[in-house]
């Protein structure tokens, strides 16, 4: 099998943002994506058989996925994403719906959510059964272009080393089915239950990857390469590597920060390969442990940074990483966005959600709420995230 790797300019990028539709008052999920997308399709002046590449359906009818075009700079990509999201948000608001993005919805019943009719989704749900029906999860995916297919596998390996960093930064799913899981990213634990999800296998050469995909197809593990749903993967048809480990993020500012970090990592790895250097590959047992620690502890995790087993607190290693990559960011024009990583370290993700829940528990019930309503504190978490998304789209502080 050969998997042609599309031509792509080095370090160009695109972003995918998975957003849930929630009731603007109750915070409960609304399975109205098919109707909303249909209305937007008409509003965009598209014919019935046209494809809108920027607004698409997802596994569940409560979810829309927004996709940017290809850009050279992070600011242009996030501006593009903001324009797309604003159109969706306005159309949703007319229906009493808000946009919500965190790694999971904190109190919804996952199995009760209707799926989008699709041969691909139906096949996946039939295969995965209970665990497939648990995938009430939302993420942010970042694609970065590579100008040479020979870089793809080493760059994927290098990005695996930084999965815990990006996961901890974005971790935003401590709650599941009304319960605090004790984890920072419940989404991570859910998604890796799929047989073709999780960390990728480690290859040095593109031919090894092609051989793996061919064998997976041969034995019926996958129908095609797109069903390799790894946390980091090469995407042959786009000529990119894709970082998929991040939990959902509520604001454009947060998305810009993780996008800048990802773009800088890929560009730095590409440059090192051009200098003839070798990308260090963490032993898979270290990579697996790092991912689990980030999902469990978030920014409080200690990560393994080399094959010798050196361990460093993530809260120390990540700022050092940002400092190391700042010259790369200056060249790429994303220095300001990369600097936004520090704000996420200070106040992002699961820590914020738990703080919102605690404040709701300590305060009086909101107007119209029952003091004994166990869902109320988690409703506050949903509405806080939705408000931050709306503020970010409106150009206010998210």
From Swiss-Prot:
It holds the Pfam family GCS2. It comes from the Bacteria. Coiled coil: none annotated. Gene3D superfamilies: 3.30.590.20. One of its GO terms (biological process) is modified amino acid biosynthetic process. Keywords: ATP-binding, Ligase, Nucleotide-binding. Its EC number is 6.3.2.2. The keyword Nucleotide-binding applies. ATP-dependent carboxylate-amine ligase which exhibits weak glutamate--cysteine ligase activity. Belongs to the glutamate--cysteine ligase type 2 family. YbdK subfamily. PANTHER family: GLUTAMATE--CYSTEINE LIGASE 2-RELATED (PTHR36510:SF1). This is Putative glutamate--cysteine ligase 2. It comes from Micrococcus luteus (strain ATCC 4698 / DSM 20030 / JCM 1464 / CCM 169 / CCUG 5858 / IAM 1056 / NBRC 3333 / NCIMB 9278 / NCTC 2665 / VKM Ac-2230).
